[in-house]
Amino acid sequence: MAKQSMKAREAKRAKLVAKFAEKRAALKVLISDVNASEEERWDAVLKLQALPRDSSASRQRNRCNQTGRPHGYLRKFGLSRIKVREACMKGEIPGLRKASW
């Protein structure tokens, strides 16, 4: 189990990403606009750098919904490989079964 503080930190990051998503996207469009002046683009870069570090989507870490485990995360299920295996063995995931050949 992940520490509660780690889960809380990830939740805080998710809120920040959602809060600043539009502003961050607008600044990135302005930065990549070749028709904008160099000064406008540079101002946009400075404004982007001034945003909170945790508002970047790449700072988020996928974690298991049940345990908070950061490694072995399977996006399709939102769980770690261990919890997917446990659920599979109990028959809780429809259509998923142990491989046999």
Curated annotation (Swiss-Prot):
Classification via Gene3D superfamilies: 1.10.287.1480
GO cellular component term of the entry, any: small ribosomal subunit
Keywords: Ribonucleoprotein, Ribosomal protein, RNA-binding, rRNA-binding
SUPFAM superfamilies, per database record: Glucocorticoid receptor-like (DNA-binding domain)
Any one Pfam family match given in the protein's UniProt record, by short name: Ribosomal_S14
GO molecular function: rRNA binding; structural constituent of ribosome
GO biological process: translation
Superkingdom, natural source: Bacteria
Family: Belongs to the universal ribosomal protein uS14 family.
Function: Binds 16S rRNA, required for the assembly of 30S particles and may also be responsible for determining the conformation of the 16S rRNA at the A site.
Description of how the protein assembles with itself and partners: Part of the 30S ribosomal subunit. Contacts proteins S3 and S10.
Name used for this protein in its record: Small ribosomal subunit protein uS14
Organism: Aliivibrio fischeri (strain MJ11) (Vibrio fischeri)
Taxonomic lineage: Bacteria, Pseudomonadati, Pseudomonadota, Gammaproteobacteria, Vibrionales
